[in-house]
Amino acid sequence: LGRYLFYDGRLSGRTHPDSLMSCATCHLQENSFECGIDHPVYQEGHPHGLTGIPTPHLMLPLINLVWNHNGYLWNGRLWKDNPDPYRRNIEDLVWMGVVAPHEMNGDTNRTKALIASIPGYPPLFKKAFGTDVVTMKRISMAVAQFVRTFISSNAKFDRYMRGEVQLTPSELNGFVLFTTEEGADCFHCHGGFGNPLFTTNLFYNNGKDTVFPGIDDRYAITGDPMDLGAYKATTLRNIELTGPYMHDGRFATLEEVINFYSHGLEWSPYINPLMHHIANGGTQLTPTEKADLIAFIRTLRDEEFLTNPAFGPPDQLP
C-alpha cells in the first residue's frame, strides 16, 4: 500500500495531469531517493512544488531512516519527543509533504477523499489496517512503513567488511584517511568502523560560514547559541549520487566538498569542537589523498539499493 501511494501522483489530491505530484516526483530511487543534480525537471537539484515555490533546502536522501533516532530534516525539527504531536516522525514528514506550499500544496481532506474514491485503494487499506476506511493518518503510516524498508547494506564497502571483496590500494588508503584524525578526520560526524550508517544523524557547525541568521539551522530548534550554523550530518551512502551538497547546495561535486574540508574551513565562535583542524583551515590533504578519499567514498555506492525493484514504481497503480 505504501509503495503504491509513494508513487501515485494523485496523493496531491488532484487528477489533472499538470497537477499530479507524488513522493517519487522528487525522491528518485536512482539518486538514493533524493533529487540529484541531474534531475530531469529540477535543475541542479533544487526542487519546487506545484506552486513553483522552491524548497528552502536541498532534500535529504531517504535511506536507512529506520535507524534515525535523532530527528529529521536538516535542523531536526521533527523529533520523537516534540511537544507538537504532528512533528515527530516519518509519518509526519509524509503529512507535511502533502500540505507544504513548496511541495504538493495539498489539502488532507481532498487527498483522503480522492484516494478513497479510487476503487483499488479501499481493499488495500482493508488488508493493511483491517478497515477500508481511508484516513490521512493511515496514508501517512503506509508511506512511512514503505520508506522504512529503504535499507542500504550491500555497497562494495559492506562486502569488504564481510570479507567478500578487497578494496583497491587507493580505496583502502582513503578508508584510513576517513577514519583517522591525522588524516581526513571524517569519522566523528560520518561514522566508520562501528557505524555502518555513515552518519551520526546529529547536527554540526562545520565551518562553512561566519554569519548565521539562525532562521533554519539547529539553533532555530534548540535556542542554544552553540547550534548556530549547525545542520545534520548526512549519510555518505550513495553520496556520489546526491549532489549538490550541503543544506544549500553550495558545492556541486564531491571534489568541491573535499577541497572545502581540506583548506576552506572558516572559524567562528560556534564551530563544533570536533572540527579539530579549524586552526589550519582544514585537513590540508594532498591531491593524492583527496583522490584516495573520494575513491573510498565511492565504495559506499550500493547498486542493489539503487535498482531494487521492491523499492521501485509498481507496474500499475490502483
Please place each PLM-identified region on the residue numbering:
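Periplasmic c-type cytochrome electron-transfer domains
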Residues: 1-318
